Structures are given as structure tokens and as C-alpha cells.
Amino acid sequence: MLADRFTGSGLPSRLMRRVLAYIALTKPRVIELLLVATIPTMLLADRGHIDIRLILATLFGGWMGAASANTLNCVADADIDKVMKRTAKRPLARDAVPTRNAFVFGVVLGLASFAWLWWQANLLSGALVVATILFYVFVYTLGLKRRTSQNVVWGGAAGCMPALVGWSAVTGTIGWPALALFGVIFFWTPPHTWALAMRYKEDYRAAGVPMLPVVATERTVTKQIVIYTWLTVLTTLALVPATGVIYAAVALVAGAWFLLMAHQLYAGVRRGESVKPLRLFLQSNNYLAVVFCGLAVDSVLGWDTIGSFFG
């Protein structure tokens, strides 16, 4: 293990385990969305130009903000994390970190992210990160998650904020392309999350979390997945006027593939077959990464946008 390797080099294993526990609180894998969304958005906002300093500074500030939100989410969800098999090994669920310490850690990260982004970018970017943290903790985690099956629909708005933060860091405003990218992630979140929840619905049921797969039939859930997948793909195409042909081609091809997977899942359920929703969950990550990577390449090349050909 990582801790063992560090122990061998002279660092106490207890200290290393504590450090790794605090890192785990921030949910590093979830923060990957920050990297996927922020960099291409910033490149689009400053089309044809790369400001490495600003990109790195925004990523660091955004990472602290996301880490803060995830840590405070762990604090609020510690009771249900102990019940669910998928989350039982999280630091607070196994008492690897005192709850009070985790709370202070999360708050400090949030304040630091605001101060950093205000200093390195602008006040709007810092304010957007604070709004994201507050929304994720109070609206989603404490308000919606345990009360409605539509929790991830509205609560997922917090995960869309990297697009707004990235755009505002470059321009100091929130332009319509940033809102379109916000919409892409907003509509992508339900099918992505519901596919996972289909696989772990008994976990959610035991924890008392009314995810859609817990309270609705598989046919209803997969139908909703198809609807939101269509909305996701259509929203990616709405961004085309602000981009070039590379992004347009990637969005079309990747969108067709994503739609095919969603429809296959729905068709399998309709036929009464044993389906594998986790496959859609995993591949939806690849879909989003491909679309945003296509946007990044398109933006770096800086070719004329499709919208410019129409005046």
C-alpha cells in the first residue's frame, strides 16, 4: 500500500494513514470532473490563447472548493455512509478522522478557495465557488438528498459550477457558452448517477435515500435516463455556434454513441433482460471526457467558429 511505502522511507505509518484519510475525505475521483470541465471552458473563453498561470491557479482554487464541498458532504452523510456497503470505508464511516476535525478541514478549504480565486482570478470566481459549496452542502446534501427522488436532478447543479468558474476566471463574466456547458453537465448528471444507483439501489434503500431506482421501476428509471441523455446531447450541440468543426464532429459522434448506450439499456429492461447499468455509468464518464477534450482541442487551434460563418 501507499502508506507502507512511505513508512519504509522513514515516515510513521500512523501519520501517513491520517494524511491519506484526509485526502480521501475530499473524494479525489469526484474532483476529476473539475479538471475535465474547467480547462476546456477556460480555453474556449480565451479562444486560441493559453494562459498557463491562470489555468493552474483556477484549477488549484477550484480543487480546494470541490475538496471543501466533498469533505463537508462526508460530515453530513457520515451516518448513512456507515450503512451503505459502497461508502462504508470512507474515513468518517470507519472513524479514521474525528468529525470535528473533518468539519474544520472542510471549512478552511472553502475559505482558502474563495481567498485564492479572488486573489488570482477575480471576485466573481471566488463567489461562485462559495455558492457551489453552500448549495452542495445545504441544498443537496441536507435538503434534497434524503427527501426526494429528484435529488440528483437539482442537486447536481453544484457539479456544473466548474464551467461557470472557469469562464468567469478568464472573462470576469458569465457568458452564454458557459451556461451551455453548465447545461451539458446538468443534464448529464441524472443518467450518470441513476445508472450507478440502479446497481446499488439496495444500499440506498437501506440508508433511507429515495434515489429514483429505489422508488420507481427499472423501466421508469431507464426511460428517464434516455430522456436526460437526449437533453445532454442536444445541449452539447447548442454550443456548436461558439466552436469550430472539430468540436461539432466530436459532439455528434460521441453523442450518437451515448444515446445508443442509453437506448440499449432501456431496450434491455423492456425485454425483461438482466441489464448492466454500471456499464453506462462508467462509459458516461468517458463520454463527458471525450466531449470536453474535443472542446479543448478545438479551442486551442482557434479556428473560426461555426457561428462566424453566419454573420
From Swiss-Prot:
Q: Where in the cell is it found?
A: Cell membrane
Q: How does it sit in the membrane?
A: Multi-pass membrane protein
UniProt keyword Transmembrane present = yes
* GO BP annotation list: heme O biosynthetic process
Taken from the record, one Pfam family name reads UbiA
Which keywords fit this entry according to its UniProt record? Cell membrane, Heme biosynthesis, Membrane, Transferase, Transmembrane, Transmembrane helix
GO MF, one term, reads: protoheme IX farnesyltransferase activity
The transmembrane residues are: 19-39, 55-75, 101-121, 123-143, 169-189, 221-241, 242-262, 290-310
Sorted alphabetically, which CDD domains does this protein's record hold?
PT_UbiA_Cox10
| InterPro entries (UniProt xref) | Protohaem_IX_farnesylTrfase, UbiA_prenyltransferase, UbiA_sf
What NCBIfam families has UniProt attached to this entry? Answer: cyoE_ctaB, PRK04375.1-2
What family does this chain come from, according to its entry? Belongs to the UbiA prenyltransferase family. Protoheme IX farnesyltransferase subfamily.
Please state what the protein is called: Protoheme IX farnesyltransferase
What organism does the UniProt record list as the source? Answer: Nocardia farcinica (strain IFM 10152)
Q: Which gene encodes it?
A: ctaB
